Design a protein with these regions (language model features):
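Catalytic Tyr-X3-Lys loop
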Residues: 43-76, 80, 84, 98, ...
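Active-site loop immediately N-terminal to the catalytic Tyr-X3-Lys motif
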Residues: 96-97, 316-320, 378
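Alpha-helical segment proximal to the catalytic Tyr-Lys
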Residues: 114-115, 295, 338-339
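Residue(s) in the substrate-gating loop at a strand-loop-helix junction
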Residues: 309
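Canonical Rossmann dinucleotide-binding motif of NAD(H)/NADP(H)-dependent dehydrogenases/reductases
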Residues: 1-12, 172-205
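A conserved structural motif in NAD(P)-dependent oxidoreductases
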Residues: 128-136, 375-383
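Conserved glycine-rich Rossmann-like NAD(P)H-binding loop of the short-chain dehydrogenase/reductase
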Residues: 7-20, 202-216
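Active-site helix of classical SDR
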Residues: 101-105, 290, 325, 333
Length: 383
């Protein structure tokens, strides 16, 4: 993957040179072996990425490979660099010893993420299932690219169930010819998502609620997309959305469920309509629309992306309704996983940390400042 992506490769030890020789040189740049002298100095320049294959680590003693590699190398990681460790899913381990070693990788990566975060660098763990090696192209390119700038300390699974094999993905305008639906597209994360997908070649259908026509239409004109105004909680919303997508575009390839609301109060002070609105917009409408799309509107090989939240994982003071709805989204994705795999489709939930949007701007100042500093990078993200 790295050779095909045009990396300027430095490898750990002479024996690793063969791997790059077999893959072919990266645009005429042969791999260079790294060595460390007795004083711990490395014969390599500042590096943008550090990648360690830990899939074969099977005991606590073998975890020393993490120290042996990262102890001398981490000091040479450049600003906004990338650290990636490859591992295996712990549930597939052949023994308790292997399971312990593979589980240890997650704690290591999360800690490294905090250590390198102050210079804008990130660290990720790719858990590659047996037989899924041919599917790592996309995930590995993503975590090493600028697209993952605000993703850090995360274990990411690579499954053998479905996916696109190495080399079959066009990396210039990869979404060319695709139709993408983005809900809540008028501003914030939704607008940024719509712009990115259009930049990568997709025709983006910008969906937002009636009342946001001006902002939504302006965005659609800017990116060459189209507009679909609908209240996602309306009883006929699933039918209206599906009919519009089929009539205008013949279906849809990508759906980003971004529309959401917050109605914050402690459970003791919360009005019932606050509870109902957060649950219905963030979870109920998402479920109904997804089920409708799967009845003939979503094309083969389709992709569902659901916006969850850190609040859905860890909970949050004054957000029982919001946290419940976003945890529900995660449960929905887990349910869909098996159902969609047989159709060549995928479903993933994204739980953003603190993103600077209109919603987070309404959070009290001290809570807002604390939230910005809680993640590995120690800062808020931009949509």
């Amino acid at each position: 993957v790295l050779a095909k992506a045009g990396a300027n490769p430095f490898v750990w030890g002479e024996e690793a040179l063969a791997s790059f020789a077999e893959a072919g040189e990266a645009f005429g740049r042969p791999a260079t072996a790294i060595s460390v002298d007795s004083e711990g100095n490395v014969n390599a320049p500042k590096l943008k990425c550090l990648v360690l294959d830990g899939t074969a680590l099977g005991s606590s003693d073998e975890l020393g490979a993490l120290y042996d590699f990262f102890h001398p190398m981490i000091r040479g990681l450049g600003k906004c660099g990338r650290v990636v460790v490859l591992g295996r899913p712990t549930e597939a381990s052949a023994s308790a010893e292997v399971a312990g070693a593979q589980a240890a990788l997650e704690g290591f990566v999360r800690s490294v993420a905090k250590e390198v975060g102050k210079k804008g660098a990130t660290a990720q763990l790719l858990r590659v299932a047996e037989g899924a090696e041919e599917n790592i192209d996309g995930p590995l390119r993503f975590v090493l690219s600028a697209r993952s700038a605000y993703v850090s300390g995360q274990p990411i699974g690579v499954s053998a169930k479905s996916g696109i094999a190495n080399g079959s993905t066009p990396w210039v305008c990869p979404l060319e010819g695709k139709v993408a639906l983005v809900t809540g597209a008028a501003r914030g994360i939704g607008a940024a998502t719509a712009r990115l997908m259009a930049l990568e070649g997709a025709h983006v259908v910008c969906l937002d609620r009636p009342g946001d026509e001006e902002a939504c239409s302006k965005l659609a004109r800017e990116i060459g997309g189209s507009v679909l105004m609908a209240d996602v909680t309306a009883e006929d919303a699933p039918e209206v959305i599906c009919e519009a997508l089929k009539e205008r575009h013949g279906g849809v390839d990508i759906v980003v469920h971004n529309a959401g609301v917050t109605r914050d109060k402690t459970i003791a002070r919360m009005k019932r309509d606050y509870w109902n609105m957060a649950i219905d917009v963030n979870l109920g409408a998402v479920t109904r629309i997804t089920e409708a799309l799967l009845e003939g509107t979503m094309r083969k090989g389709g992709r569902f992306i659901f916006l969850s939240s850190i609040a859905g994982i860890a909970g949050n003071m004054g957000q029982t309704n919001y946290s419940a709805s976003k945890a529900g989204v995660i449960g929905l994705v887990k349910f869909l996983e098996e159902q969609l795999a047989d159709k060549g489709m995928t479903a993933n939930a994204i739980a953003p940390g603190f993103i600077e949007t209109r919603l987070t701007a309404a959070i009290p100042f001290m809570i807002r400042e604390a939230a910005r500093r809680m993640n590995s990078l120690g800062q808020g993200g931009l949509p």
